[in-house]
């Protein structure tokens, strides 16, 4: 019997959608040696993820959906569960980007109900922290990038 857990958050990054998406993908593709910008769907890696337990859990991380300047989706799976993380990017009229991150986790093997609720509680807290961090990092890194571009233009002038 499987159990589902869904989480979703939306925030604003203060830059154009193309800039936000390109910067996000530049960081995301570092994990995938076979990343193909034209069609990265199907790229996958094996990765050990630490969860606080005695030993790390071996997972497969695969890019399962991709639309340039619109969507990036990865599926992380192991023998116990599967988590689909979807990042959607929507350009706004004011030149900012609305970034929505949603996660759907399915536990494939029976897990004691109390354990499941505790895991979900901590997962939601971690998800919120991670989301705020992603928005903050994107805003800060893009700000620094564009400040450096401006400085470089002034030096040439």
Give the predicted meaning of each segment:
Residues 1-41:
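Hydrophobic ligand-binding cavity/cleft-lining segments
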Residues 3-5, 55, 81, 95:
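Residue-level preference for beta-strand/loop junctions
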Residues 14-18, 64-69, 88-100:
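A short, structured loop/turn motif at beta-sheet edges
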Residues 16, 20, 123-126, 130, ...:
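Short amphipathic alpha-helical segments
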Residues 25, 30-84, 133-157:
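Glycine-rich portal/gate segments that line the openings of hydrophobic small-molecule binding cavities
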Residues 79-129, 149-151:
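Beta-strand/loop substructures that line and gate deep hydrophobic ligand-binding cavities in soluble
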């Amino acid at each position: 019997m499987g159990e589902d857990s869904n989480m979703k958050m939306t925030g604003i990054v203060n830059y154009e959608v193309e800039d936000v998406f390109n910067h996000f993908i530049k960081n995301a593709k570092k994990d995938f040696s076979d990343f193909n910008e034209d069609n990265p769907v199907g790229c996958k890696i094996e990765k050990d993820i630490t969860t606080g337990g005695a030993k790390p859990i071996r997972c497969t991380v695969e890019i399962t959906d991709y639309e340039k300047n619109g969507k990036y989706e990865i599926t992380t799976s192991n023998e116990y569960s599967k988590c689909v993380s979807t990042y959607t990017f929507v350009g706004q009229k004011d030149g900012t980007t609305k970034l929505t991150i949603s996660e759907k986790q399915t536990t494939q093997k029976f897990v004691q109900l109390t354990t499941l609720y505790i895991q979900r509680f901590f997962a939601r807290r971690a998800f919120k922290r991670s989301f705020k961090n992603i928005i903050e990092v994107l805003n800060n890194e893009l700000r620094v990038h564009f400040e450096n571009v401006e400085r470089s233009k002034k030096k040439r002038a």
